[in-house]
Amino acid sequence: GVETHVIEFAPMLMDEQLDQMGGEQLRRKIESMGVKVHTSKNTKEIVQQGTEARKTMHFADGSELQVDFIVFSTGIRPRDKLATQCGLAVAQRGGIMVNDSCQTSDPDIYAIGECASWNNRVYGLVAPGYKMAQVAVDHLLGSENSFTGADLSAKLKLLGVDVGGIGDAHGRTPGARSYVYLDESKEVYKRLIVSADNKTLLGAVLVGDTSDYGNLLQLVLNAIELPENPDSLILPAHAGSGKPSIGVDKLPDSAQICSCFDVSKGDLIAAINKGCHTVAALK
């Protein structure tokens, strides 16, 4: 079989979406599958020779790893060369600088998507690009609309492991409190980050079981008030009373149902009222 290694520059896996305990749990689950994980590794050079394999990776800490085959996963890099040549302002870490209206340093030129840098941040996801496009169009038409950032919540399956990160997954909001559920036998870790008054969900981390993701995401996006015991949202059914869920009737019309195309509950209701009564018709 093939011996597989994961080399990560950050101190933990998925450090944007997961907290430290979530990252450690993910690492344990991946390593239990036989995959070796190396974190805090800065690759200095790759040499086309080795005593045990075809290539040798040299890291900044002096260590090395011999491998036969390398797959790079480097994310996105904003293409801002044209903007630089035109004299437009470019962010220090790359990307064409834009304001809340998606205007560049030249107010007659707009930039959206992965080439744009808003508040020194480049979004590598499609949903923020759609949101930027809407803001730019509205501004061109004279309507008031502003880009104020985008939700980077994500749910995915990494090497067969269910992982989810929502909102302030690191609990950086001042006064934030946490509820943690850990089942070591089933390798499940869940954490809720709530406001100081215990009424608003600020973020969540899910590793090993993401069945609560949709419910928690709507609570965060729509600032819906939490039940009296927020931990009931992540505790298993056998731990007590039934798990509370958010019914569609409780969601505001502005609630986002599809992030890729920015479809809201109100959009779906309007389509249904116009005669779209099947899933195919709604699509």
Regions inferred by a protein language model and the residue ranges of each:
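Rossmann-like dinucleotide-binding cores of NAD(P)H-dependent redox enzymes
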Residues: 2-45, 129, 147-163
